[in-house]
Amino acid sequence: MRCIVSYKSLRSCLVNVPELLLESISEPVQNYAVQAVVCKNDIKKTFYFGISGIPSQFSFEIDSTYAHTLKLAENQEINLSIIDCTHEIEQLEIEPVTSNDWEIAERNAAWLEENLLVQYRVATTERFIIYLPSGTFIQFQPLKLIPSSLCGRLLRTTEVLITPKPNTSAIEVKENRKVNLRCVVENRLLPDSVTADSPALCVFLPLNFPDRPDVVYMDGGNLKSTIVCQCVSCPFQIPGHFFISKSLALSYSIKTGFKFQIWKAHNPPSSSKFILEQKGLPPESNLSSELVAAKLKNSYLMDGMTLKLVDIAVSYSVSGLSGVVKNPIQDIKITSDTNVPVNAGIRNNSPRLSMQPFPHEFAQVRNAVFLHQNIYINGPKGCGKSNLVHSLFDYYSLNSIYFQMIVSCSEIDRSSFAKFQSFWNNVFIQAERYEPSIIYLDDVHCLISSSNENGELGFVEEREIAFLQHQIINLKRKRKIIFIGFGEEFLTFSENLVLPLLFQIKIALPSLAVTRRKEILTTIFQENFSDITMDSIEFISVKTEGYLMTDLVLFVKRLLSEAFVEKIQNGPKHLMNKGLIEKTLKDFVPLQLRKAKFVKSSIRWIDIAGMQEAKEAVRDIIESPVKYSLIYKQCRLRLPTGILLFGYPGCGKTYLASAISSTFPVQFISIKGPELLDKYIGKSEQGVRDLFSRAQMAKPCVLFFDEFDSVAPRRGQDSTGVTDRVVNQILTQMDGAESLDGVYIVAATTRPDMIDPALLRPGRLDKLIFCDLPNEEERLEVLQKLANRFHIENAAMLKKLSTLTDGYTYADLSSLLYDAHLIAVHKLLKRVSINAVDPSQTTSSFTNLTTESKRNASMLALPPESRYNQNMQSMSDSKSVVIEDYMLMEALKKNSPSLNSEEFEHLSNLYRDFRSKLFEPELNARNTDVGSKTRQI
């Protein structure tokens, strides 16, 4: 395509091409390049450019400065074509055109590292420019492309090497010139060949350092006075930086990012003898003095310094004239200080693993840091956030030049805005002084969460958040500072409003899968030197569904303690047997479940009479998937997880649901409908989210919604909109992007027609079970189950009652027997009062008494209060009270069905219409389509 060159202030090496060319691209523009052929004086020259993706007006738009660099004139005709830029550059070596360009590049090395690909995407052998935020630009000349090619695509993994081009006249400096450099504590960026034979206390300076000294003075940073250090020349260069050995950094508490003045030491201190007073270990420590002394060869020691060496958990107080250690055996004498307690190091209550339990999220954070974006990582307490913080801190300490700081937001003094502002100003000053910086904000939710009941921020809180927002946004624009926040999920409206302003990326830590739990448990047991079989670890990983990382650590500690106790009591054989593991699992309660209220009912499954269809459905949906979870996981079909029990009042819906907790190996959470509703916006939805989150943590778990029609009515009928939002949230939780793995929903209602129809569709409440009035056989079974609790004189009377109680519900039958029992109790009380004769009227003759008289005589020998208590104790057993036939008939006369004919007819018509509307289309489809989904009525 022929077009003309048009100048435009693009401030980039990317170009704009006509829309006609862009339409021919089917993939992202990053995968393509523009080939521009220029013909001048019968000489053709080809250029290659990266595409910006912005269409132009029938012209080839290019930055004017970049065009002058390539000698492309405005309005010059060129031929354009789109080519597939599949060639990837692994290494690009470039050189600044002038020494001024080198100085600018050296001062802005960190910015270039992050933003080079934004302006220069397709590498060629032609000169190019990079614009800086200040408005200046740097010219570079490519020297080498590996693999060699006319053009290639730059990736984030491409290694870019900048060859220094120093000003030769400026290198000829005075002897005592001080050079300002930013320090980096020794890490993996340094080649092993440089650090292998280096002294324990030294600095690594670039090759272009003036005079390449062997010994240097260093001042600034956090040093109280000038120190002298051994110098090692390092071919690996980061402009404006130097490396410092780990031992030297530990001894003087130096961190990456501190800035120092360094100059050549013309008259360094000579060799000297030193006394090292050992601190941190008792005298019987087997730490070799010769080993410590050997590490200090060719190192400079200062009088009064505190010496700390890598891999040695002890510190030394140095005394002697400042100088270098030439002969360690002769020059160093080590003594012990028994008055100093053992140095246990930094205590951290959070469990920390040597492995990374969240590799995917760890990679996400690394990518976000590469893009210079703020990140917020959320998860419940104990899920592994602290472990991730330390993993990130260790990673960037070993692989970057970032200054790092951890801020605990929960410990900030917020008694006044002045103190709050002063604290953060100090943090921001350090981050700005030592940039590039990464600031870890722990417990961020403590800053943004509101203490008000309605979730709204107060005036002081809004002022604090506005201050933080202003400072963080300004620092992000002007400085290379990255904020990584950790905390719990933001749920309220005000929190979600503030979150995107402070953090661009939000990462939620997921629950631990079985394989991940197995890896974590293996690591924990290995770190505790426990001999446990892999079969036992796999068994524990399967049984710890919903456990957080902290739960796993605490569980292993509990298990090891139980094993130790068993070892003392029963000997060392079979310490980690399955019985011990199961016992520990049964007694252990995860952190997230310690505040949860789980229901354990005394109702047994065998106590439920009738309702065979409902009981079979509950077993199919809940018991089988839980009991045979490994088999069901291999099934790719989506299993039903919801049951709706609907029917007449008193027909056993709640009774059946209550028996689940005592029958199946699941946790049971019961929710009364109205308790989820709240007058404040967002609170009801938050309650629903918390409820499902608790259930997910406790899985396998059953959520039982009683009176479901009150919490999930048809949308559009509530003037306040509260129930509409609750229904929307329940729909999202039940059948949203995140599946309810291991969480089962059981709902009960008398009015299914009032429930929102969306909740009754497949994928939500899959099984709709009608709980009808019991028939004669079911009534007899109910009466027989209830009769086991009482003493019925004539069991055959129950058959007669079952025929006389047509229209009775399960609750009515239970009330009938309880009324009969109450009649029997009243009769017994009357008999007891008659037998309680006054003691003054009794005789002393107790000979030839009948059995009943003997009992009465023994009662009369007791005080009146004792006689009454013993009578009541004999009546406390329900089976000691005999229910006779006439009592049952008398109770039947007093009772009547709780549903009168009008209510029964109304509900019957309602259930008939509900079932016909809901199921007739499916029944018709089932007659024509084989394999259609069926639903249970």
From Swiss-Prot:
Family, as annotated: Belongs to the AAA ATPase family.
Oligomer status and interactors: Interacts with pex6; forming the pex1-pex6 AAA ATPase complex, which is composed of a heterohexamer formed by a trimer of pex1-pex6 dimers.
UniProt-listed Enzyme Commission number(s): 3.6.4.-
GO molecular function, one term: ATP hydrolysis activity
Name of the molecule in the record: Peroxisomal ATPase pex1
Species: Schizosaccharomyces pombe (strain 972 / ATCC 24843) (Fission yeast)
Functional description taken from the UniProt entry: Component of the pex1-pex6 AAA ATPase complex, a protein dislocase complex that mediates the ATP-dependent extraction of the pex5 receptor from peroxisomal membranes, an essential step for pex5 recycling. Specifically recognizes pex5 monoubiquitinated at 'Cys-6', and pulls it out of the peroxisome lumen through the pex2-pex10-pex12 retrotranslocation channel. Extraction by the pex1-pex6 AAA ATPase complex is accompanied by unfolding of the TPR repeats and release of bound cargo from pex5.
Record-linked SMART domains: AAA (SM00382)
Reactions mediated catalytically: ATP + H2O = ADP + phosphate + H(+)
Membrane topology of this protein: Peripheral membrane protein
